[in-house]
Amino acid sequence: VTLDVIELRDHAHDVVNNLLTGFPSPSLESAINTVVSADALIAVTPIFSTSYSGLFKSFIDVLDPNALTGKPVLIGANAGTSRHSLAIDYAIRPLFTYLHAAPVSTGVFAASGDWGHSGEDGVDASPLAERIERAARELATAILAREAVTPVLDPFDPESYLGGGRSFGHLLGGLAGE
């Protein structure tokens, strides 16, 4: 397993410049390519005012709208209190669903109170550790079960629904006995 970590704060200026110009810097392009070519994503954001951070959303905005189609995603977030935990299901999950990604069922939320729960043997015995393990198992299962994804079809191009390289005219010719 290869794990690539992308710290968005390192690309903040490049993200803004891309939004203004439409052209990514080499370092931002590398980050985008890392995300697009990944077998799966673990997307984690701090929660601000009951939603994901602006930088997180801005990075998502510079991705091609179809870049995450079918990609398994483990969603994570952190905030000061557990009151913000609903942001996973009411802000972050809908974002990835809109992009046709495949978020796993368990999201991981960490509040300040989730830290520092170790058992007698020094192993983390917190509910947070249990959520992380459950979400990781779901992500691993999604990666192993992932099949080839059907591309998103263009609703304004009837030929995109035919597949197999046949044209709409070819299909109509077959109906007419040609």
Which role fits each region the language model picked out?
Residues 109-178:
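Glycine-rich phosphate/pyrophosphate-binding loop and the adjoining helix
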Residues 86, 90-94, 102, 130-133, ...:
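Residues on a specific face of well-ordered alpha-helices
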Residues 23-100:
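Helix-loop-strand module that forms the ligand-binding subsite of alpha/beta enzymes
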Residues 1-57, 158, 162-178:
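N-terminal beta1-alpha1-beta2 submodule of the flavodoxin-like/Rossmannoid cofactor-binding fold
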